[in-house]
Protein backbone atom coordinates (compact mmCIF):
# COMPACT_ATOMS: atom_id res chain seq x y z
CA UNK A 1 0.00 0.00 0.00
CA UNK A 2 1.27 3.44 -0.83
CA UNK A 3 2.46 5.64 1.97
CA UNK A 4 0.23 8.66 2.02
CA UNK A 5 -0.33 11.12 4.80
CA UNK A 6 -3.00 9.86 7.11
CA UNK A 7 -5.98 12.07 7.29
CA UNK A 8 -8.15 11.69 10.24
CA UNK A 9 -11.30 13.10 11.58
CA UNK A 10 -11.19 14.08 15.34
CA UNK A 11 -13.30 15.02 18.29
CA UNK A 12 -12.36 16.90 21.53
CA UNK A 13 -13.43 14.99 24.62
CA UNK A 14 -12.67 16.85 27.89
CA UNK A 15 -14.08 16.61 31.42
CA UNK A 16 -17.88 16.45 31.27
CA UNK A 17 -19.12 14.28 34.11
CA UNK A 18 -22.81 14.78 33.50
CA UNK A 19 -22.80 13.89 29.80
CA UNK A 20 -23.51 10.50 28.25
CA UNK A 21 -23.47 7.15 30.01
CA UNK A 22 -20.21 5.54 31.13
CA UNK A 23 -19.11 3.01 33.68
CA UNK A 24 -16.24 0.73 34.61
CA UNK A 25 -17.15 -2.91 34.08
CA UNK A 26 -14.11 -4.75 35.46
CA UNK A 27 -15.64 -8.10 36.50
CA UNK A 28 -13.01 -8.67 39.23
CA UNK A 29 -11.89 -5.29 40.59
CA UNK A 30 -8.59 -5.43 42.45
CA UNK A 31 -8.94 -3.49 45.74
CA UNK A 32 -5.15 -3.05 45.80
CA UNK A 33 -5.22 -1.15 42.52
CA UNK A 34 -6.44 2.45 42.79
CA UNK A 35 -8.93 3.89 40.34
CA UNK A 36 -7.54 5.92 37.46
CA UNK A 37 -9.55 8.82 36.08
CA UNK A 38 -8.64 9.35 32.45
CA UNK A 39 -9.23 12.52 30.44
CA UNK A 40 -9.95 11.44 26.87
CA UNK A 41 -9.06 14.19 24.41
CA UNK A 42 -10.28 13.26 20.95
CA UNK A 43 -10.76 15.61 18.02
CA UNK A 44 -12.02 15.64 14.48
CA UNK A 45 -8.40 15.77 13.47
CA UNK A 46 -6.34 16.65 10.44
CA UNK A 47 -2.64 16.18 9.89
CA UNK A 48 -2.02 19.90 10.33
CA UNK A 49 -3.19 19.66 13.93
CA UNK A 50 -6.12 22.06 13.59
CA UNK A 51 -9.02 19.85 14.60
CA UNK A 52 -12.71 20.31 15.29
CA UNK A 53 -16.12 18.74 15.54
CA UNK A 54 -19.47 20.19 14.58
CA UNK A 55 -17.96 23.35 13.08
CA UNK A 56 -18.87 22.64 9.44
CA UNK A 57 -22.34 24.13 9.07
CA UNK A 58 -22.35 23.75 5.28
CA UNK A 59 -21.62 20.11 4.46
CA UNK A 60 -21.58 18.67 8.03
CA UNK A 61 -18.44 16.72 7.16
CA UNK A 62 -17.27 16.94 10.79
CA UNK A 63 -20.66 16.21 12.36
CA UNK A 64 -20.54 13.93 15.40
CA UNK A 65 -23.92 13.38 17.05
CA UNK A 66 -23.34 10.04 18.79
CA UNK A 67 -20.23 8.41 20.21
CA UNK A 68 -19.28 5.13 21.85
CA UNK A 69 -16.03 4.20 23.56
CA UNK A 70 -15.35 0.64 24.74
CA UNK A 71 -12.18 -0.34 26.61
CA UNK A 72 -10.78 -3.87 26.97
CA UNK A 73 -7.96 -5.50 28.88
CA UNK A 74 -5.20 -6.06 26.31
CA UNK A 75 -4.27 -9.45 27.77
CA UNK A 76 -7.58 -11.06 28.74
CA UNK A 77 -9.86 -9.26 26.29
CA UNK A 78 -12.41 -8.51 29.02
CA UNK A 79 -14.39 -5.29 28.78
CA UNK A 80 -13.31 -2.92 31.55
CA UNK A 81 -15.11 0.34 30.69
CA UNK A 82 -17.56 1.89 28.26
CA UNK A 83 -19.11 5.25 27.44
CA UNK A 84 -22.09 6.11 25.25
CA UNK A 85 -23.63 9.39 24.18
CA UNK A 86 -26.41 9.55 21.63
CA UNK A 87 -27.25 13.25 21.72
CA UNK A 88 -24.23 15.45 21.09
CA UNK A 89 -25.66 18.80 20.03
CA UNK A 90 -24.79 20.43 16.72
CA UNK A 91 -23.42 23.44 18.60
CA UNK A 92 -21.09 21.27 20.68
CA UNK A 93 -17.57 21.90 19.42
CA UNK A 94 -16.08 20.54 22.65
CA UNK A 95 -17.64 17.31 23.95
CA UNK A 96 -16.46 16.27 27.40
CA UNK A 97 -16.42 13.16 29.58
CA UNK A 98 -14.14 11.11 31.84
CA UNK A 99 -13.66 7.38 32.18
CA UNK A 100 -12.69 5.45 35.31
CA UNK A 101 -10.26 2.55 34.85
CA UNK A 102 -7.75 0.38 36.66
CA UNK A 103 -4.06 0.63 35.68
CA UNK A 104 -2.82 -1.77 33.02
CA UNK A 105 -2.62 -2.38 29.28
CA UNK A 106 -5.86 -1.45 27.53
CA UNK A 107 -7.35 -1.52 24.03
CA UNK A 108 -9.59 1.46 23.21
CA UNK A 109 -12.31 1.37 20.53
CA UNK A 110 -14.15 4.51 19.39
CA UNK A 111 -17.23 4.47 17.14
CA UNK A 112 -19.34 7.44 16.02
CA UNK A 113 -22.61 8.05 14.17
CA UNK A 114 -23.83 4.45 13.93
CA UNK A 115 -27.66 4.16 14.14
CA UNK A 116 -28.96 2.65 17.40
CA UNK A 117 -25.37 2.26 18.50
CA UNK A 118 -25.85 1.55 22.19
CA UNK A 119 -28.47 -1.13 21.51
CA UNK A 120 -26.32 -2.70 18.81
CA UNK A 121 -23.31 -2.82 21.15
CA UNK A 122 -25.14 -4.00 24.26
CA UNK A 123 -24.13 -7.64 23.76
CA UNK A 124 -20.40 -6.88 23.48
CA UNK A 125 -18.69 -8.37 26.54
CA UNK A 126 -15.13 -8.93 25.29
CA UNK A 127 -12.68 -7.83 22.62
CA UNK A 128 -13.58 -10.72 20.34
CA UNK A 129 -17.17 -9.45 20.23
CA UNK A 130 -15.90 -5.94 19.55
CA UNK A 131 -13.65 -7.05 16.71
CA UNK A 132 -16.60 -8.81 15.13
CA UNK A 133 -18.72 -5.66 15.47
CA UNK A 134 -16.01 -3.61 13.75
CA UNK A 135 -15.58 -6.09 10.90
CA UNK A 136 -19.26 -6.43 9.96
CA UNK A 137 -20.13 -5.15 6.49
CA UNK A 138 -22.81 -2.46 6.69
CA UNK A 139 -24.77 -0.70 3.95
CA UNK A 140 -23.88 2.95 3.59
CA UNK A 141 -26.92 5.19 4.02
CA UNK A 142 -27.83 6.35 0.48
CA UNK A 143 -27.75 9.99 1.59
CA UNK A 144 -24.05 9.66 2.46
CA UNK A 145 -23.10 9.29 -1.20
CA UNK A 146 -24.27 12.91 -1.52
CA UNK A 147 -23.57 14.50 1.87
CA UNK A 148 -23.80 14.26 5.63
CA UNK A 149 -26.52 16.10 7.52
CA UNK A 150 -26.94 17.63 10.95
CA UNK A 151 -28.76 14.51 12.17
CA UNK A 152 -26.89 11.94 10.09
CA UNK A 153 -23.11 12.30 10.14
CA UNK A 154 -20.67 10.03 8.35
CA UNK A 155 -19.86 6.83 10.30
CA UNK A 156 -16.42 7.03 11.94
CA UNK A 157 -14.17 4.82 14.04
CA UNK A 158 -10.73 4.39 15.54
CA UNK A 159 -8.94 1.72 17.55
CA UNK A 160 -5.87 2.09 19.79
CA UNK A 161 -4.28 -1.16 20.98
CA UNK A 162 -2.06 -1.87 23.97
CA UNK A 163 -2.26 1.58 25.56
CA UNK A 164 -0.66 1.91 28.99
CA UNK A 165 -2.97 3.28 31.67
CA UNK A 166 -0.80 4.40 34.59
CA UNK A 167 -1.66 5.17 38.19
CA UNK A 168 -2.79 8.72 38.80
CA UNK A 169 -5.53 11.21 38.15
CA UNK A 170 -8.55 12.17 40.19
CA UNK A 171 -12.18 12.83 39.39
CA UNK A 172 -11.43 16.56 39.30
CA UNK A 173 -7.98 16.32 37.71
CA UNK A 174 -7.99 13.32 35.38
CA UNK A 175 -4.90 12.16 33.53
CA UNK A 176 -4.81 13.07 29.82
CA UNK A 177 -5.21 10.12 27.48
CA UNK A 178 -2.51 10.29 24.78
CA UNK A 179 -3.02 7.38 22.39
CA UNK A 180 0.19 6.32 20.64
CA UNK A 181 1.85 9.41 22.09
CA UNK A 182 -0.53 11.85 20.36
CA UNK A 183 -2.61 14.46 22.12
CA UNK A 184 -5.87 13.43 20.45
CA UNK A 185 -8.00 10.47 19.56
CA UNK A 186 -8.41 10.73 15.80
CA UNK A 187 -11.55 9.26 14.27
CA UNK A 188 -11.53 8.16 10.65
CA UNK A 189 -14.51 8.53 8.33
CA UNK A 190 -15.47 5.35 6.50
CA UNK A 191 -15.89 7.25 3.22
CA UNK A 192 -13.60 9.16 0.88
CA UNK A 193 -14.46 12.54 -0.62
CA UNK A 194 -14.72 13.09 -4.39
CA UNK A 195 -14.26 16.73 -5.42
CA UNK A 196 -14.67 17.60 -9.11
CA UNK A 197 -14.04 21.17 -10.28
CA UNK A 198 -14.97 22.21 -13.82
CA UNK A 199 -12.53 25.01 -14.57
CA UNK A 200 -13.57 25.49 -18.20
CA UNK A 201 -16.67 24.51 -20.16
CA UNK A 202 -19.15 24.34 -17.30
CA UNK A 203 -21.84 25.85 -19.50
CA UNK A 204 -21.77 22.68 -21.63
CA UNK A 205 -22.03 20.26 -18.70
CA UNK A 206 -25.26 18.36 -18.07
CA UNK A 207 -24.29 16.18 -15.09
CA UNK A 208 -21.52 14.32 -13.27
CA UNK A 209 -22.17 10.84 -11.90
CA UNK A 210 -20.20 8.57 -9.57
CA UNK A 211 -20.24 4.98 -10.83
CA UNK A 212 -19.38 1.62 -9.21
CA UNK A 213 -19.44 2.98 -5.66
CA UNK A 214 -19.22 0.30 -2.99
CA UNK A 215 -22.51 -0.51 -1.24
CA UNK A 216 -20.76 -1.59 1.94
CA UNK A 217 -18.40 -0.18 4.51
CA UNK A 218 -16.69 -1.54 7.61
CA UNK A 219 -15.47 0.20 10.74
CA UNK A 220 -11.99 -1.19 10.09
CA UNK A 221 -10.09 -1.03 6.78
CA UNK A 222 -11.45 -3.31 4.10
CA UNK A 223 -9.43 -6.31 2.98
CA UNK A 224 -11.49 -7.56 0.04
CA UNK A 225 -12.99 -6.19 -3.16
CA UNK A 226 -16.58 -4.90 -3.28
CA UNK A 227 -19.22 -7.35 -4.41
CA UNK A 228 -22.21 -4.98 -4.57
CA UNK A 229 -22.35 -1.57 -6.16
CA UNK A 230 -24.50 1.52 -5.73
CA UNK A 231 -25.46 4.09 -8.29
CA UNK A 232 -24.83 5.79 -10.51
CA UNK A 233 -24.88 8.68 -8.03
CA UNK A 234 -25.31 12.18 -9.44
CA UNK A 235 -22.79 14.44 -7.75
CA UNK A 236 -24.04 17.45 -5.82
CA UNK A 237 -23.22 20.87 -7.18
CA UNK A 238 -22.09 23.31 -4.49
CA UNK A 239 -24.45 26.24 -4.91
CA UNK A 240 -23.77 28.14 -8.12
CA UNK A 241 -20.06 27.28 -8.12
CA UNK A 242 -18.17 25.03 -10.51
CA UNK A 243 -17.58 22.43 -7.81
CA UNK A 244 -19.33 19.04 -7.54
CA UNK A 245 -19.04 16.75 -4.50
CA UNK A 246 -19.74 13.12 -3.72
CA UNK A 247 -18.62 10.50 -1.22
CA UNK A 248 -17.69 6.84 -1.62
CA UNK A 249 -16.91 3.97 0.76
CA UNK A 250 -13.47 2.44 0.78
CA UNK A 251 -13.02 0.04 -2.14
CA UNK A 252 -10.13 -2.40 -2.53
CA UNK A 253 -9.12 -3.27 -6.10
CA UNK A 254 -6.56 -6.01 -6.73
CA UNK A 255 -3.39 -4.96 -8.52
CA UNK A 256 -4.07 -7.51 -11.28
CA UNK A 257 -7.05 -5.43 -12.44
CA UNK A 258 -7.02 -2.17 -14.32
CA UNK A 259 -9.37 -0.14 -16.50
CA UNK A 260 -10.49 -2.35 -19.41
CA UNK A 261 -9.07 -5.45 -17.72
CA UNK A 262 -11.56 -6.18 -14.95
CA UNK A 263 -13.46 -8.98 -16.67
CA UNK A 264 -16.66 -6.98 -17.16
CA UNK A 265 -17.89 -4.17 -19.40
CA UNK A 266 -18.74 -1.91 -16.44
CA UNK A 267 -15.12 -1.96 -15.16
CA UNK A 268 -16.31 -3.11 -11.73
CA UNK A 269 -14.99 -2.81 -9.02
CA UNK A 270 -13.19 0.36 -10.18
CA UNK A 271 -14.76 3.63 -9.00
CA UNK A 272 -15.07 6.26 -11.71
CA UNK A 273 -17.06 9.37 -12.48
CA UNK A 274 -18.86 10.15 -15.71
CA UNK A 275 -19.28 13.58 -17.26
CA UNK A 276 -22.17 14.04 -19.68
CA UNK A 277 -22.30 17.18 -21.79
CA UNK A 278 -25.42 18.91 -23.06
CA UNK A 279 -24.43 17.72 -26.52
CA UNK A 280 -24.53 14.09 -25.41
CA UNK A 281 -20.79 13.45 -25.16
CA UNK A 282 -19.79 11.13 -22.31
CA UNK A 283 -16.39 11.00 -20.59
CA UNK A 284 -15.43 8.36 -18.03
CA UNK A 285 -12.68 9.25 -15.55
CA UNK A 286 -11.30 6.39 -13.40
CA UNK A 287 -10.50 7.29 -9.78
CA UNK A 288 -7.01 6.23 -8.73
CA UNK A 289 -4.77 6.56 -5.70
CA UNK A 290 -1.41 7.89 -6.85
CA UNK A 291 1.19 10.04 -5.12
CA UNK A 292 3.61 12.13 -7.11
CA UNK A 293 3.82 13.01 -10.77
CA UNK A 294 1.53 11.22 -13.21
CA UNK A 295 3.61 8.97 -15.54
CA UNK A 296 3.60 10.45 -19.02
CA UNK A 297 2.23 13.73 -17.69
CA UNK A 298 -1.37 13.06 -18.77
CA UNK A 299 -3.95 11.67 -16.39
CA UNK A 300 -6.34 9.72 -18.61
CA UNK A 301 -3.83 7.48 -20.47
CA UNK A 302 -2.32 6.49 -17.12
CA UNK A 303 -5.65 6.10 -15.29
CA UNK A 304 -7.11 4.01 -18.11
CA UNK A 305 -4.21 1.54 -18.01
CA UNK A 306 -2.78 2.47 -21.41
CA UNK A 307 0.80 2.75 -20.11
CA UNK A 308 3.18 0.06 -18.93
CA UNK A 309 2.89 1.44 -15.40
CA UNK A 310 -0.54 0.70 -13.95
CA UNK A 311 -2.14 2.80 -11.22
CA UNK A 312 -3.73 1.65 -8.00
CA UNK A 313 -7.52 1.82 -8.27
CA UNK A 314 -8.10 1.26 -4.56
CA UNK A 315 -10.08 4.08 -2.95
CA UNK A 316 -9.07 4.63 0.67
CA UNK A 317 -11.29 5.91 3.46
CA UNK A 318 -10.88 9.46 4.72
CA UNK A 319 -8.96 10.63 1.62
CA UNK A 320 -9.85 13.67 -0.48
CA UNK A 321 -9.69 12.98 -4.24
CA UNK A 322 -9.60 16.26 -6.17
CA UNK A 323 -10.08 16.69 -9.92
CA UNK A 324 -9.82 19.86 -12.01
CA UNK A 325 -11.26 19.45 -15.47
CA UNK A 326 -11.38 21.42 -18.68
CA UNK A 327 -14.12 20.29 -21.04
CA UNK A 328 -13.05 21.03 -24.61
CA UNK A 329 -15.03 20.54 -27.84
CA UNK A 330 -13.78 17.00 -28.45
CA UNK A 331 -11.93 15.98 -25.27
CA UNK A 332 -11.33 16.76 -21.62
CA UNK A 333 -8.16 17.65 -19.73
CA UNK A 334 -7.82 16.30 -16.20
CA UNK A 335 -5.64 17.44 -13.29
CA UNK A 336 -5.58 15.22 -10.20
CA UNK A 337 -4.37 15.34 -6.61
CA UNK A 338 -4.94 13.74 -3.21
CA UNK A 339 -4.85 15.88 -0.10
CA UNK A 340 -5.87 15.87 3.54
CA UNK A 341 -9.61 16.03 4.17
CA UNK A 342 -9.56 19.23 6.22
CA UNK A 343 -12.69 20.95 7.45
CA UNK A 344 -12.25 24.07 9.50
CA UNK A 345 -8.80 25.49 8.92
CA UNK A 346 -7.36 26.74 5.63
CA UNK A 347 -10.07 26.83 2.99
CA UNK A 348 -8.53 25.95 -0.37
CA UNK A 349 -9.75 26.00 -3.94
CA UNK A 350 -7.71 24.18 -6.57
CA UNK A 351 -8.18 25.80 -9.94
CA UNK A 352 -6.67 24.74 -13.23
CA UNK A 353 -3.01 25.69 -12.82
CA UNK A 354 -3.43 27.63 -9.58
CA UNK A 355 -4.60 27.32 -5.98
CA UNK A 356 -6.42 29.86 -3.82
CA UNK A 357 -6.08 29.37 -0.07
CA UNK A 358 -7.65 31.38 2.74
CA UNK A 359 -6.47 30.97 6.32
CA UNK A 360 -8.30 31.85 9.54
CA UNK A 361 -6.68 35.30 9.62
CA UNK A 362 -8.09 36.20 6.19
CA UNK A 363 -4.83 35.86 4.26
CA UNK A 364 -5.72 34.89 0.70
CA UNK A 365 -2.81 33.28 -1.13
CA UNK A 366 -2.84 32.54 -4.86
CA UNK A 367 -0.15 30.09 -6.02
CA UNK A 368 0.52 28.77 -9.51
CA UNK A 369 0.79 24.98 -9.69
CA UNK A 370 2.14 24.86 -13.25
CA UNK A 371 3.72 27.10 -15.89
CA UNK A 372 0.78 29.10 -17.23
CA UNK A 373 0.23 30.91 -20.50
CA UNK A 374 -1.61 34.14 -21.24
CA UNK A 375 -4.34 34.85 -20.53
CA UNK A 376 -3.97 33.86 -16.89
CA UNK A 377 -5.96 36.20 -14.67
CA UNK A 378 -7.20 35.12 -11.26
CA UNK A 379 -9.65 37.76 -10.04
CA UNK A 380 -10.83 37.90 -6.42
CA UNK A 381 -14.01 39.80 -5.55
CA UNK A 382 -14.95 40.59 -1.94
CA UNK A 383 -18.68 40.35 -1.21
CA UNK A 384 -21.28 41.39 1.35
CA UNK A 385 -19.19 44.01 3.12
CA UNK A 386 -15.83 42.27 2.88
CA UNK A 387 -12.88 44.18 1.43
CA UNK A 388 -9.14 43.92 0.79
CA UNK A 389 -6.51 45.72 2.85
CA UNK A 390 -7.66 48.69 4.91
CA UNK A 391 -10.05 50.46 2.52
CA UNK A 392 -13.69 49.27 2.42
CA UNK A 393 -13.88 50.41 -1.22
CA UNK A 394 -11.17 47.93 -2.30
CA UNK A 395 -13.33 44.96 -3.26
CA UNK A 396 -11.34 43.31 -6.07
CA UNK A 397 -7.75 42.25 -6.80
CA UNK A 398 -6.07 40.35 -9.64
CA UNK A 399 -3.17 37.92 -9.97
CA UNK A 400 -1.49 37.55 -13.37
CA UNK A 401 1.90 35.91 -12.74
CA UNK A 402 2.65 33.02 -15.13
CA UNK A 403 5.62 31.20 -13.57
CA UNK A 404 5.15 27.84 -11.88
CA UNK A 405 5.26 28.43 -8.11
CA UNK A 406 4.61 32.17 -8.36
CA UNK A 407 2.54 33.35 -5.41
CA UNK A 408 0.89 36.46 -4.00
CA UNK A 409 -1.01 37.06 -0.76
CA UNK A 410 -3.88 39.50 -0.18
CA UNK A 411 -5.63 40.30 3.10
CA UNK A 412 -9.43 40.11 3.11
CA UNK A 413 -11.42 41.67 5.96
CA UNK A 414 -14.69 39.77 6.47
CA UNK A 415 -15.70 41.13 9.89
CA UNK A 416 -18.90 42.68 8.52
CA UNK A 417 -20.00 39.49 6.75
CA UNK A 418 -22.66 37.36 8.44
CA UNK A 419 -21.83 33.74 9.19
CA UNK A 420 -23.13 31.55 6.36
CA UNK A 421 -22.81 34.33 3.76
CA UNK A 422 -20.34 34.59 0.90
CA UNK A 423 -17.34 36.84 1.47
CA UNK A 424 -15.08 36.00 -1.48
CA UNK A 425 -15.57 34.95 -5.09
CA UNK A 426 -12.90 33.60 -7.44
CA UNK A 427 -13.04 34.16 -11.21
CA UNK A 428 -10.57 32.82 -13.76
CA UNK A 429 -10.07 34.85 -16.95
CA UNK A 430 -13.40 36.64 -16.43
CA UNK A 431 -15.13 38.65 -19.13
CA UNK A 432 -15.68 41.92 -17.26
CA UNK A 433 -18.26 43.08 -19.80
CA UNK A 434 -20.40 39.96 -19.60
CA UNK A 435 -23.46 39.55 -17.39
CA UNK A 436 -24.45 36.52 -15.36
CA UNK A 437 -20.89 35.19 -15.04
CA UNK A 438 -20.73 32.38 -12.47
CA UNK A 439 -17.74 32.41 -10.09
CA UNK A 440 -15.37 29.46 -10.16
CA UNK A 441 -15.37 29.34 -6.36
CA UNK A 442 -17.34 31.00 -3.56
CA UNK A 443 -15.90 31.14 -0.03
CA UNK A 444 -18.48 31.17 2.79
CA UNK A 445 -17.86 32.64 6.24
CA UNK A 446 -18.01 29.95 8.93
Swiss-Prot record:
Keywords: Cell outer membrane, Fimbrium, Lipoprotein, Membrane, Palmitate, Signal, Virulence. Residues 1-20 form the signal peptide. InterPro entries: FimB/Mfa2/Mfa3. One of its GO terms (cellular component) is cell outer membrane. It comes from the Bacteria. A lipid is attached at residue 21 (N-palmitoyl cysteine). Component of the fimbrium tip. Minor fimbriae are composed of a structural subunit, most often Mfa1, and the accessory subunits Mfa3, Mfa4 and Mfa5. Fimbrium assembly occurs by linear, head-to-tail oligomerization of fimbrial subunits. This is mediated via insertion of a C-terminal beta-strand from one subunit into a groove in the N-terminal domain of the following subunit. Mfa3 is required for Mfa4 and Mfa5 insertion into the fimbrium. Tip subunit of the minor fimbriae. These filamentous pili are attached to the cell surface; they mediate biofilm formation, adhesion onto host cells and onto other bacteria that are part of the oral microbiome. They play an important role in invasion of periodontal tissues and are recognized as major virulence factors. Fimbrium subunits from different strains have highly divergent sequences, and this correlates with pathogenicity. This is Minor fimbrium tip subunit Mfa3.
